UniProtKB/Swiss-Prot annotation:
Keyword Glycosyltransferase: no
CDD domains given in the database record: KAZAL_FS
Gene: EPI10
GO terms for cellular component: extracellular region
Keyword field contains Glycoprotein: yes
Name the record gives this protein: Extracellular protease inhibitor 10
Disulphide bridges: C26-C56, C30-C49, C38-C70, C96-C126, C100-C119, C162-C193, C167-C186
Length: 228
């Protein structure tokens, strides 16, 4: 009886460990860009990043079955619970998209009203406003993308293409195993994602010490400045 109880505790501990590891590996957020995709589980996700997040958290291997909303989406939303970014904002809000990329690719609705891109049109329809922030600003650039800088993926993520990964602008330098200093841990993670063959990991906080020739150069420069 005692052995059975001990075995049960061990199984619970293993399950908890696996669950905690899964949560750590899935600690990334996604941009609130509304570009719906249909999952292999028959549920609709706000975009492919949210599908990957759901797949990661559920460990069910959910894949994209197609672009756009599924023919019939279950009553319960497929979008994961909101993920808090480093800036304190949340993403994954069920329903209307909260932001769109400032990419100028004009489209018109059935009434002939023009929008900066498909996402802004979908947002306006969803919220029932007919309002296009990007179009009113007259800026077809990527200022919103630069301004938001929402955390998109955790460091070391080596999943699908890294093109939709963004990091906050905070300066908290870290040292990489490749001998480079990165502005913050998230930036190191993006490089690791883009170059999985290098298996770049964080080896410490702060900037890398200046050594060798670099030290000599820095010293010589300091001496010149002092003499000047």
């Amino acid at each position: 009886m005692k052995s059975a109880f001990t075995l049960s505790l061990a199984l619970v501990a293993v399950t908890a460990t696996i669950s905690a590891a899964a949560d750590d590996n899935c600690s990334f957020g996604c941009l609130d860009v509304y570009k719906p995709v249909c999952g292999s589980n028959g549920e609709t996700y706000s975009n492919s990043c949210y599908l990957r997040l759901a797949s990661c958290k559920s460990n069910n291997g959910i894949t994209e079955a197609g672009d756009g909303e599924c023919a019939s989406t279950p009553a319960s939303s497929a979008t994961p619970s909101p993920v808090t970014s480093s800036t304190g904002s949340t993403s994954g809000t069920v329903g209307c998209p909260d932001m769109c990329l400032d990419v100028y690719d004009p489209v018109s609705d059935e009434n002939g009203k023009e929008y900066s891109n498909q996402c802004y049109m979908e947002m306006a329809k969803c919220k029932g406003t007919g309002y296009d922030d990007n179009k009113r600003s007259g800026n077809p650039g990527i200022s919103t993308l630069d301004a938001e800088r929402k955390l998109a993926f955790a460091p070391g993520y080596q999943g699908p293409p890294c093109g939709d990964m963004l990091c906050p602008d905070n300066y908290a330098p870290v040292c990489g195993s490749d001998g480079e200093t990165y502005p913050n841990e998230c930036d190191l993670g993006i490089t690791s994602c883009n170059h999985p063959e290098q298996n770049i990991t964080m080896v410490g906080e702060g900037t890398l010490p200046v050594t060798g020739a670099a030290t000599a150069t820095a010293t010589a420069t300091a001496e010149v400045v002092t003499r000047w």
